[in-house]
Regions:
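Short, non-transmembrane amphipathic alpha-helical segments
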Residues: 49-66, 100-107
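Extracytoplasmic juxtamembrane/flexible linker immediately downstream
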Residues: 1-30, 34, 143-148
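Short, surface-exposed beta-strand segments enriched in small/polar/acidic residues
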Residues: 34-46, 62-95, 116-130
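Generic alpha-helical secondary structure
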Residues: 2, 6, 49-56, 91-99
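A generic short-segment signal for beta-strand/edge and adjacent turn/coil regions
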Residues: 1-5, 41-46, 86, 99-104
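Extended Gly/Ser/Thr-rich low-complexity repeat segments
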Residues: 44-54, 144-148
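Short secondary-structure junctions
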Residues: 11-20, 66-70, 109-113
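Periplasmic OmpA/Pal-like peptidoglycan-binding modules at the C-termini of bacterial envelope proteins
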Residues: 92-148
Length: 148
């Protein structure tokens, strides 16, 4: 069940990054990991550290297996610095490039795009938040324009 899924994810993250911070909501339905960006990326770049490949592979396998039983999603939230990027500066913004690299790493390991959600928030902490939660159904979360 859910407790086994959470325990497996905790083992995966804590094995890859021993000082990772984890939190479970009071209802026990969501699990969140908080990781310094420096543990995932090369300094000042959007290049993922080679030592993290197994983390992405193991998380992807765990999420895929769980989603086959219960629709489960992963949200990736990254701090963007003191201000969010402007429309003109999006493609050059480091936080945007980093969240893109994370998504590509998970997609490359087979995680379905429908199970990944991303967000960017202002903040100087330079952390990445990974949240895992159950979706209410297997239905698509969004519809194409015109499908309304």
């Amino acid at each position: 069940g859910l407790a086994v899924f959470h325990a497996k994810l905790k083992r995966v993250y804590e094995t890859a990054i021993p000082l990772v911070e984890s939190r479970v909501t009071t209802k026990g339905d969501q699990l969140q990991f908080i990781i310094p960006q420096s543990q995932l990326f090369e300094d000042g770049r959007d290049v993922l550290r080679d030592t993290r490949k197994e983390l992405f592979s193991d998380v992807s396998q765990t999420l895929i297996k769980r989603s086959g039983v219960v629709p489960t999603d992963m949200e990736i939230l990254i701090n963007a610095g003191s201000e969010l990027p402007t429309e003109d500066g999006i493609k050059d913004h480091l936080a945007i490039r980093r969240v893109h690299a994370l998504v590509e790493a998970f997609l490359g390991q087979g995680t379905p795009a429908r199970n990944i959600y991303v967000g960017i928030k202002p903040g100087k902490e330079k952390k990445v938040y990974f949240k895992f939660y159950i979706r209410n159904s297997y239905d698509n979360q969004f519809s194409k324009v015109g499908d309304q």
